[in-house]
Amino acid sequence: VDIGFKIRDAINIYYETNFQEDPTSNFQWEFVLVDDDQTKNAWCMPGGKIAFYSGILPILKNADGVASVMGHEIAHAVARHSAERASTAMVTDLGIMALEQFILGQRLPQAAGYVRQFGLDLPFNRKQESEADYLGLIFSNLAGYDIDESYKVWERMKEDMGGSGPSEFFSTHPSPDNRITKLKEWIPLVNAKYPAIST
């Protein structure tokens, strides 16, 4: 919980310092640990509700690992990814329904799901995940955590999954290998541009 509030405070100072409106100013922050040792996951809902499952803690290993995932989850909330996904899904469904009626004169119940999953949702979600990875690095670094731990978390996650994990084409997330590569590229840039701030 302290890690989440420390990152929250760093975000507040970041936006204040840059004379920008803080997108988290109306959030009701809540950090929950779900007692489930089998689930290795964390998630964020709009408005600052963040949950970690106890099963992910051995992979995170330390406060810097927790901060890397916490920063990532908070970044989803800051970037309002949930709202983006909902509006994209609605527009896609309406467009597919119109095409089905115009071209075929009937609805194909599975069509919208397949088009969204393989044509729009997956790449869009991977893009959001990459954005959250980058913003998460910034937020964690501003809060004073060691962001080198971010790619180490993914190395441990990859090992836990028994290799590289699912094919990136079929996944909403970038592959662990791609994530590790990108995080290693971004870390020196983030360290130089967004040093830790005093909270």
Where are each of the predicted segments found?
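Beta/coil-rich, acidic/histidine-enriched accessory regions frequently appended to metallopeptidases
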Residues: 166, 170-199
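Acidic/histidine-enriched alpha-helical segments
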Residues: 83-94, 148-158
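Short helix/loop segments within enzyme catalytic domains
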Residues: 1-23, 109-172, 196-198
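Membrane-active amphipathic alpha-helices enriched in small hydrophobic residues
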Residues: 87-120
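Peri-catalytic and regulatory segments of divalent metal-dependent proteins
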Residues: 1-90, 103, 142-143, 162, ...
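Catalytic-site beta-strand/loop segments enriched in glycine and acidic/polar residues
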Residues: 51, 67-78, 108-125
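Residue-level signature of catalytic and energy-coupling elements of molecular machines
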Residues: 52, 132, 175
